[in-house]
Swiss-Prot record:
Region (Disordered): 703-734, 763-844
GO molecular function, one term: deubiquitinase activator activity
Organism: Saccharomyces cerevisiae (strain ATCC 204508 / S288c)
Lineage: Eukaryota, Fungi, Dikarya, Ascomycota, Saccharomycotina
SMART domains reported in the protein's UniProt record: BRO1
Residues recorded as bearing Phosphoserine in the entry: S740
GO cellular component, one term: cytosol
Protein name (Swiss-Prot/TrEMBL): Vacuolar-sorting protein BRO1
Length: 844
């Protein structure tokens, strides 16, 4: 038996100019001056050449390669454009496959990229069937593989390209072609077994495979049967006859081998019934055998079937005497589909990878907006990862620097080495006490030179400034209720922040006052040293510990060097991580996965971020090792100090040393809190000055407006003096909007200062170590100016006093602005307390 495969025809097309289409698209997207930056003329010419080859007169194997590559280019472009492929403004023209004279010359033109893809995919499937036909006499296995690929292509077409104007691409027709390819691949599998030596063990296998082949041809037959008589059947007319013949023939073949299987199991009666059914189906196929006579030996199979029938009937009559069922259950034969088709994506995958780099160059100017949005989300994920590592690294570096600075480790090790290198196990110098004394001296200098060292005085200053502001605000008329409310709200917020700030240093006022007085601090510190014996007894000295101390010092020096190396390694790893994150680009990956959901994209981002884990792990390892090594150094230093002191210490001396350490720790905490207090308090004072200037300026404006109203009661009011917009900055006197209308309009506006307050901010800040949380404070200086609300030009001021007032105010504001620019802070990062949206209840 020889296989017969349907002859599918290719679709024809008209020439296409990709150079014109892509250049036109890029010009519209980037303009005539920039589009060439994203245009690769050589790659575009290669794309035109590739399409011409894909639709040329080449061998099927070469055509398949050209078409698969061309489709890969289309797929990469589709990833970028999606359903917006019509923006290319290109005419894709394709002709229907000519199976009849009625289809000759039928062509369809569309602007969508999906139409070009579907037509190309149709031709790819047809080419696979042509390759299968070429190799059918040499290797069934190769033909089965190509028919399976054709089946996958047609199936993908039927499921993903719907409502096409082309008859070839209509969903029901591509599904019909998919079933034909599937049935033919299954048929080749059966014929491969039939043409080899058949054993009795293969009867049931052939029966099941033939049953599956029959079912597949049944689907094709049903499709042709459903078409009305007045509608032309898709394909050649002989297809229907051939499908009908194969349907009955493989049903007969399945029943025949099932009968042989029953005979092997000594179920002769059922076997005879299935052979009778097989004969009926074979006879049903004979009227449709016209196109298959040269491929299937119908007569030979009929003779074999008749011979087997007679043999079984004779055996049953003389030996078995089993009853023969009148009707057989053909469904009892289980169909076995031997075709496992790969997905179309799997077939295309190697070609997609092969042209990926070329597509990145060719389509680099075509990137959808949603890809940029998703890339920004991924960039934020990377930034979060980097910030975390930077913060951990900075914290570790600060821990290292603080440890080295606090212990003065290099000098300490040098002094200890000198002390014990000559075998001197004891020195009457209290090393630990000397280190404490040096540190306290540094702290005293810091406190005594700081202008905010008197905490009570600073508290009184703040209270006085609040009182000044409240006195001014209480004197303002009711029509300024909105501005008064805003200023009071800012005052309340600043007061709350100051209370937290002062709460940080109040528990340490005693220690701060001590550090502010050299006499008192050294008197107090010396109290802890009075009970230290000035000279020990020689009997208390254990000089056998000298070698051990030197060994410990050697280990500490090694650990100190390792700490320095760890710090350098951590910084180097962080630099590498920053470079990798900055150079990481997943635009291509996002384009390929453009259709994924947010959950799938999140999983994709997590997978992509895993490539940074090695460097992150190395950074974390250096941090962990540093902490462990610092603890080890501390333990060894304690052991050295213990060994270098007397063998036995009185309990009273131990108590004094412990009290001294506690006293030193309290001073350290006090200095930490005062450092935070001293850095934040100037910002608070500056803010109160700003509120005071605003309140004073508002009161002055109201007074001037009142005088103007009284003096011009019977005439239109002149506008307020114009203000220099450059002087309107945070920290200076606030500016009111310039008005060119009468005072009645000014009063009705309520002298609104909302525009001026946009840049003043109060927000909660960062937590303080070893104390209550204190919000970070800053005052961001950004110009705000009143803008005229009417077209009439402002009338210049008439009084010289106002000119002098404006000049003084402008100079003061410029000085404050220059000071803020030289010392910027990060306070008040929340939206401004003067934001109009926060006062909506007053904006009726």
């Amino acid at each position: 038996m020889k296989p017969y495969l349907f002859d599918l025809k290719l679709k024809d097309t008209e020439k296409l100019d990709w150079k014109k289409g892509l250049s036109s698209y890029l010009k519209k997207s980037y303009g005539s001056s920039q589009w060439r930056t994203f245009y690769d003329e050589k790659a575009t010419s290669e794309l035109d050449h590739l399409r011409n080859n894909a639709n040329g007169e080449l061998a099927p194997s070469s055509l398949s390669e050209q078409n698969l590559k061309y489709y890969s280019f289309l797929e990469h472009l589709y990833f970028r454009l999606g359903s917006k492929g019509s923006r290319l403004k290109m005419d894709f023209t394709w002709y229907d496959a000519e199976y009849s004279s009625a289809q000759k010359g039928l062509k369809y033109t569309q602007h969508t990229l999906a139409f070009e893809k579907s037509c190309t995919l149709f031709n790819i499937a047809v080419i696979f069937t042509q390759i299968a036909r070429e190799n059918i006499n040499e290797d069934y296995k190769n033909s089965i593989a190509n028919l399976t690929k054709a089946f996958s292509c047609f199936e993908y077409l039927s499921e993903n390209f719907l409502n096409s104007p082309s008859v070839d691409l209509q969903s029901e027709n591509t599904r019909f072609l998919a079933n034909i390819c599937h049935a033919e691949a299954q048929e080749l599998f059966v014929l491969k077994l039939l043409n080899d030596q058949i054993s009795s063990k293969q009867y049931t296998l052939i029966s099941k495979l033939s049953r599956a082949t029959c079912n597949l041809f049944q689907k094709c037959h049903d499709f042709m049967k459903e078409i009305d008589d007045d509608v032309a059947i898709y394909g050649e007319p002989k297809w229907k006859t051939t499908v009908t013949c194969k349907l009955h023939f493989y049903k007969s073949l399945s029943a025949y081998y099932h009968g042989l299987h029953l005979e092997e199991e000594n179920r002769v009666g059922e076997a005879i019934a299935f052979l009778d059914f097989s004969m009926q189906q074979l006879i049903s196929s004979l009227p449709f055998k016209t196109w298959l006579v040269e491929f299937i030996d119908f007569d030979g199979f009929k003779e074999t079937l008749e011979k087997k029938q007679k043999e079984l009937i004779k055996d049953n009559d003389f030996i078995y005497h089993e009853s023969v069922p009148a009707v057989v259950q053909v469904d009892s034969i289980k169909a076995l589909d031997a075709i496992k088709s790969p997905t179309w994506e799997k077939i295309l995958e190697p070609y997609m990878q092969d042209v990926a780099n070329k597509c990145d160059s060719l389509y680099r100017g075509i990137i959808p907006l949603d890809v940029y949005e998703k890339e920004s989300i991924y960039s934020e994920e990377k930034a979060t990862l980097l910030r975390k590592q930077v913060e951990e690294t900075e914290t570790a570096n600060l821990e290292y620097s603080s440890f080295i600075e606090f212990t003065n480790l290099p000098r300490l090790l040098s002094d200890l080495e000198k002390q014990f290198s000559d075998g001197n196990i004891f020195s009457n110098t209290d090393t630990q006490g000397q280190l404490m004394r040096d540190q306290i001296q540094t702290w005293c200098k810091f406190i005594q030179t700081n202008e905010f060292r008197d905490i009570e005085e600073q508290m009184n200053k703040i209270v006085f400034k609040r009182k000044q502001i409240l006195e001014i605000l209480s004197a303002l008329p009711n029509d300024q209720k909105e501005n008064v409310t805003k200023l009071k709200s800012s005052l309340v917020a600043a007061s709350n922040s100051d209370e937290k700030l002062f709460a940080c240093v109040k528990p340490h006022i005693v220690e701060i006052n001590l550090l502010n007085d050299n006499g008192k601090i050294w008197k107090k510190f010396d109290e802890f040293n009075r009970n230290t014996p000035p000279q020990p007894s020689l009997l208390d000295i254990d000089d056998t510990k000298n070698d051990k101390i030197l060994e410990l010092l050697k280990q500490v020096k090694g650990h100190a060097e390792d700490l320095r190396t760890l710090k350098e390694e951590r910084s180097r790893n962080l630099s590498e991580l920053r470079d990798e994150i900055n150079n990481d680009d997943i635009t291509k990956l996002l384009i390929i996965n453009k259709g994924k959901s947010d959950v799938e994209l999140k999983d994709l981002f997590e997978v992509e971020l895993e490539k940074f884990e090695p460097l992150s792990t190395r950074i974390e390892a250096t941090i962990y090792k540093q902490s462990s090594m610092i603890d080890d150094i501390k333990a060894k230093l304690d052991e050295i100090f213990h060994l270098s002191n007397f063998k036995d210490k009185s309990s009273g001396e131990e108590k004094f040393l412990e009290d001294r350490k506690n006293f030193f720790d309290k001073l350290q905490e006090a200095v930490k809190s005062f450092s935070i207090f001293a850095s934040d308090l100037p910002k608070g004072i500056e803010f109160y000055d700003s509120l005071f200037n605003m309140s004073r300026d508002l009161a002055e404006r109201v007074r001037v407006a009142k005088q103007t109203e009284d003096s011009t009661a019977n005439s239109p009011a002149p506008p307020l003096p114009p203000l220099d917009s450059k002087a309107s900055v945070v920290g200076g006197p606030p500016l009111l909007p310039q008005k060119s209308a009468a005072f009645q309009s000014l009063s009705r506006q309520g002298l609104n200062l909302g525009d001026q307050f946009q840049n003043l901010k109060i927000s909660a800040g960062s937590d303080l170590p070893q104390g209550p949380g204190i919000p970070p404070r800053t005052y961001e200086a950004s110009p705000y100016a009143a803008t005229p609300t009417m077209a009439a030009p402002p009338v210049p001021p008439k009084q010289s006093q106002e000119d002098m007032y404006d000049l003084r105010r402008r100079k003061a504001v410029e000085n404050e602005e220059r000071e803020l620019q030289e010392n910027p802070t990060s306070f008040y990062n929340r939206p401004s307390v003067f934001d109009e949206n926060m006062y909506s209840k007053y904006s009726s």
